[in-house]
């Protein structure tokens, strides 16, 4: 039996979105009314943080913690609709298919690279020097318009490469 291994890291990953597609996908998520949030990667319509369902790709859950007395707590999950608001990192992950991709490590590398690009743009456009994209996203002075503008600048940079 002859085994053939990929000749490059990205061979066979044709189902992955390009960097430009991920940026544009993240922009579409953030640009929607109420599509941007600070803090959590993903939030539902009630503003509660949601997580991808580990055992059911494409589905989302909300984690509930209940006090059961005498210092005890019980945690359970409940299914919810797809998230409707995203932080910048969450929007990139969603657009890259990070949580439901067949290639999570490649998607993570792509997200890391795009977060680095956005951070460089954010730091060059302002007097601030944020250590990471989360710090920019969660800064009290950052607005939804700032997040949209940052993604539009990145999309324009990729459009110029064509």
Residue ranges: model-predicted function:
Residues 1-162:
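Domain-length accessory/inserted modules outside core catalytic folds
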